Amino acid sequence: MSQTALQKVVEHARAGLEVRESFFEQYSQLVVDVSKALAVRLALGSKILFCGNGGSAADCQHLAAELVNRFKLERPPLPGIALTTDSSILTAIGNDYSYEMVFEKQVQALGQPGDVLVGISTSGTSPNVISALKEAKRKGMVTIGMTGISAGEMLPICDHIISVPSKDTAVIQEVHIAVGHLFCHLIDHFLFEAVGELEPYLSGE
């Protein structure tokens, strides 16, 4: 058996575990707060849009599916849309305008004030994600950035930042999907198990 291969497994698992533990030790309350903010917007009839590239695009589709179908709890479908899935829209915008605008124009078309845009970029600098977040901000949407150790250009344009303390793309993505699962889990908790906790946030709307 290859000791080199086994060592790679152990090293990757250890690195991922260390980053995951560090993140949740520091930011568990942030995850709860962002989840509650998402639940409030859904309770008020808004929707959640997601955008990202590559592995982050896959996370967008994964999380939108958990909202529309279900996570663990049996409950009504929730409005989550991944802006990464329609090849005709993506290629039309990319061809006629630029790849930088593939998410921005979808936010222009689909986003409404009070909706949420979750932009996922491990570097924090993906131009099309940044453009979409800026457009969402202009439209009065709630903006959430999920990134790595550097928030990059996301920081001034996001209401909430999930920053994973790592420069390793794979490790960042592993923590992102763990956080995304917790978003889904806690959204269900606040909307269907602990509705009273949202009342103070809904009464002023």
Curated annotation (Swiss-Prot):
Could you tell me which residue ranges the SIS domain spans? 38-200
Task: List where in the cell it is found.
Answer: Cytoplasm
Q: What's the main place this protein lives?
A: cytoplasm
Q: Where does Zn(2+) bind?
A: H62, E66, Q173, H181
Q: Name one Pfam family in it.
A: SIS_2
User: Might you report a single GO cellular component term?
Assistant: cytoplasm
Cofactor(s) demanded? Zn(2+)
Q: Which cysteines are joined by disulfide bonds?
A: none
Q: What reaction is this protein's catalytic activity?
A: 2 D-sedoheptulose 7-phosphate = D-glycero-alpha-D-manno-heptose 7-phosphate + D-glycero-beta-D-manno-heptose 7-phosphate
Explain the purpose of this protein. Answer: Catalyzes the isomerization of sedoheptulose 7-phosphate in D-glycero-D-manno-heptose 7-phosphate.
Additional free-text comment from the UniProt record: The reaction produces a racemic mixture of D-glycero-alpha-D-manno-heptose 7-phosphate and D-glycero-beta-D-manno-heptose 7-phosphate.
UniProt name for this protein: Phosphoheptose isomerase
**Gene name, Swiss-Prot/TrEMBL:** gmhA
